[in-house]
Amino acid sequence: MILQIRDAGVKLILAIVLYGTTLDGTTNFSHSYPFCGPSIGLCLEDEVLVGVLADPFRDELYFAAKGNGAYMNDLHNTGTPQKLSVTSVDTFHKALFSSGFPHDKESQMFKNMLERFIRLEYESHSIRKTGSAALSLAYVAAGRIDGYVASGLHSWDMAGGILIVEEAGGKVTDFEGHPYMMSNREWLISNGTLHDTLVELLKID
């Protein structure tokens, strides 16, 4: 949807975009591995306004609206929503991360991600490769993991979870620490406390 606004005689054209996927984690699903689910994000240009994720296997619904916090409830949203908050872990050796890789194993992006994975594995408590970007973001927001490092992703993989992480107190950027854009293919998500050190650790010359 295109929104047109006139401000002081100047017409501004803003794009409201709905990014989503009916199933994030398709490879998991194809192997009957129960870590996947739908994801949707409503964006104004590159700013996410509303994000919703679901984990049907654990009866969990994650949602956030800009400026109103992030919450988790059951899938029917019948219980009392639990407000989400990222961890306060501030040292790598105590931190648990999730990671995601590009599908093309011959690409430079894959090779760079593999180098980052090795660095992070040495420095952190451990890393998980979950196979679902959306639920990895939900787990950062819920304080179950401390960060998510991934390459090769698309806007529809990320849009639903970005705001949920931010509203829970986390941070979302590219690998250089720059503010994210929906066109990004490489993403760095953390509890915020670890973020600057993560950026330095994962730099590739």
Identify the function of each model-found stretch.
Residues A142-G147, G170-K171:
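Alpha-to-beta junction loops
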Residues G169-R185:
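Acidic, metal-binding active-site segment of PIN/NYN-like and related structure-specific nucleases
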Residues M1-L23, K171, P179, T193-L194, ...:
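N-terminal subdomain of lithium-sensitive/metallo-dependent phosphomonoesterases centered on the IMPase/IPPase/PAP
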Residues I40-S136, N184-D205:
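Acidic beta-strand-loop-alpha-helix segment within the catalytic core
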Residues A138-A141, I162-E167:
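Hydrophobic residues within well-ordered alpha-helices
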Residues F101, S151-L153, E176-H178:
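Short secondary-structure boundary segments
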Residues G25-G37, F57:
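Substrate-binding/gating loop at the entrance of the active-site cleft, primarily
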Residues L12-I16, F92, A141-R144, M182-N184:
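A short, glycine/Asx- and small/polar-enriched loop/turn
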